[in-house]
């Protein structure tokens, strides 16, 4: 076995500040030069009666903040160091440095377009209190509460107010149509994990085709603005499909079009990113890529069952069992089962939504382990963190037993036993 340390590989992303510097900085400075005379009053007295101009090579961006204006439009607030020249009557120019702010807008929708007329030179940082901030890679910075509200706003914008006040069957398909996206399907070649891919622009998908007894790969041209469903994925076969894989791609379209455009990707397929060896500078890129998928996963689940639709039903069915002498796991299971029956949605979707909305007791209900649902159970909320579980499959138990010596010692001493999806204290 090799003793060489594993090399960590991370995505190599292009950031917006670097893109502006490399592609638009000189043009932006030309716009700024035209606005300099309006700031003479706050500049050195030697500038009076002179012509002002910028030394482009020695003017630079010190700090950049990016703000989301819409699905495809953003504002860049740049704190800049400007080397300004002042010349008069053909004399040699005198140079001085001013630190100032400027704001300018871009549209990113397959291509990147700068809007020169939006450029404004400022003497102080503009207020952006109610705007959504973007990371340097143009990923929206949302808290989980923000995502809940953003999902509701998206549904209301495209489908109307009723989309967040009453359950909408096939809402994912309706949203796709309202966004002017189309849906297609194909069996992706040797790929059972990817559920769907959004193509922002025309692209190529590698699909399977049967030739006699052999499965071969063929390339398919996928039109722009198409969600391609993978017919090899398990979600494609589910009878109780809630459209989460479609919502997932709609979230990418609504929240991440600018991110994917900046990375010059024609589809929302993060596997197409280039990777390199990790270093300190590349860590934020890896974090942002994780957030792109986390936002789409959270948003798709929230869209499938919006909070204003779910919570009244939860309160209704909880009231039926709140005073019964059964464990909280059984009470939550009753709520989940009744909503699933009423709206014909999966119990897993409801369970996940309850956990994410602050009801960790739902972890004790409808756990599918070893090919069946195990008994509902209750637990001390303080004894498990948000990312942990009390449930383990037989295969996972055996893997731990083989790989973890301290765990193996506890089991061999018969202090704990495996029973019904749990590792239990042997009483």
Which positions does each model-derived feature cover?
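Active-site hotspot residues in diverse enzymes, especially metal/ion-binding acidic/histidine motifs
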Residues: 1-427
């Amino acid at each position: 076995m090799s003793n060489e340390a594993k090399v960590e590989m991370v995505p190599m992303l292009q950031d917006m500040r670097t893109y502006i510097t490399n592609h638009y900085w000189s043009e932006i400075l030309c716009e700024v030069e035209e606005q300099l005379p309006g700031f003479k009053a706050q500049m050195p007295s030697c500038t009076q009666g002179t012509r002002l101009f910028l030394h482009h090579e020695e003017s630079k961006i010190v700090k950049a903040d990016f703000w989301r204006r819409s699905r495809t439009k953003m504002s860049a607030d740049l704190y800049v160091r400007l080397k300004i020249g002042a010349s008069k009557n053909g004399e040699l120019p005198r140079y001085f440095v001013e630190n100032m702010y400027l704001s300018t807008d871009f549209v990113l929708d397959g291509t990147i377009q700068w809007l020169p007329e939006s450029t404004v030179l400022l003497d102080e940082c503009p207020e952006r209190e109610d705007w959504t901030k973007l990371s340097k890679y143009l990923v929206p910075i949302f808290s989980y509460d923000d995502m809940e509200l953003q999902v509701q706003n998206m549904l209301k914008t495209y489908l109307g107010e009723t989309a967040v006040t009453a359950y909408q069957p096939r809402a994912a398909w309706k949203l796709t149509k309202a966004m002017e996206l189309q849906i297609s399907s194909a069996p992706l070649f040797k790929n059972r994990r990817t559920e769907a891919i959004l193509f922002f622009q025309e692209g190529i998908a590698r699909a399977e085709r049967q030739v006699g007894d052999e499965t071969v790969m063929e390339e398919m041209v996928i039109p722009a603005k198409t969600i391609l469903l993978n017919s090899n994925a398990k979600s494609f076969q589910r009878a109780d499909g809630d459209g989460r894989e479609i919502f997932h791609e709609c979230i990418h379209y609504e929240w991440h079009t600018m991110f994917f455009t900046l990375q010059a990707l024609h589809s929302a397929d993060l596997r197409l990113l280039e990777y390199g060896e990790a270093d300190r500078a590349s860590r934020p890129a890896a974090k942002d890529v994780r957030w792109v998928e986390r936002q789409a996963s959270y948003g798709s689940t929230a869209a499938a069952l919006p909070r204003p639709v779910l919570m009244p039903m939860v309160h209704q069915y909880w009231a039926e069992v709140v005073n019964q002498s059964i464990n909280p796991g059984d009470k939550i299971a009753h709520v989940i089962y009744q909503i699933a029956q009423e709206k014909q949605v999966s119990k897993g979707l409801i369970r996940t939504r309850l956990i994410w909305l602050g009801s960790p007791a739902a972890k004790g209900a409808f756990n599918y382990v070893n090919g069946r649902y195990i008994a509902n159970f209750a637990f001390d909320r303080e004894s498990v963190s948000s990312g942990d579980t009390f449930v383990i499959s037989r295969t996972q138990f055996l893997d731990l037993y083989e790989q973890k010596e301290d765990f193996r010692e506890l089991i061999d001493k018969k202090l704990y036993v495996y029973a019904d999806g749990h590792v239990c204290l042997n009483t």
